[in-house]
């Protein structure tokens, strides 16, 4: 179910008001020729051919498709995957960023793709790392349009003086 919470109240004897809170979509994976959306805990929410704006496409999750059930946790090999994906998704929403895809490489690495730019964000400090992406992408687009490359944020800390960008030819 995509409903996280529902509250019904009577506004007056003839009016019932329903307050519905939907579960947030942390990402989606390709599944049986559709998109399978999941929440921050890895619960399969629903399948759809539709792609929702602001929800990242996720690669790198290993699971047995025959064991997936809507409303149940997706049976992935690495349970920490959803924690990292949910954490990254939270800050992508906060900073109004939608990557073309999010790749869960392993428990040590999440990689975001924005066009031809690959952003390595590691597995911690997501807020300060993701906060840097939008201004950097804008600067790259302005100074080096269409330049493919790797943005190294995996070791970036709040007191870091610089961020490396490795262009690809």
Describe every region a protein language model picked out.
Residues 2-169:
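Charged, solvent-exposed interaction patches on well-folded alpha/beta domains
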